[in-house]
Amino acid sequence: MERARRTIAAAIRDGRFFARGDTGQPVEALQAMFALYGYDLPVSATFDARMGAVVTAFQRHFRPARIDGVADASTITTLRDLIAALPGR
């Protein structure tokens, strides 16, 4: 999980965001983070429709000011902070 956090942190620093159609290790790391937080999301390294639905649901609950299904810095930072606040973290 630490590797996933480092990968995502680097992506945030680079100003990256993730949307449907994106693939690769950073998407895989983000999927692992959503799964760790409790979302039923397979880790496939592909930002597909299912991942888009998870991101949208997450935003609807935790960031209702902007619900667009794009995993931007605000979405990723919120997820990271919520994971850090989990018991035992």
Give the predicted meaning of each segment.
Residues 1-89:
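Cell-envelope/ECM-targeting effectors and their regulatory/trafficking segments
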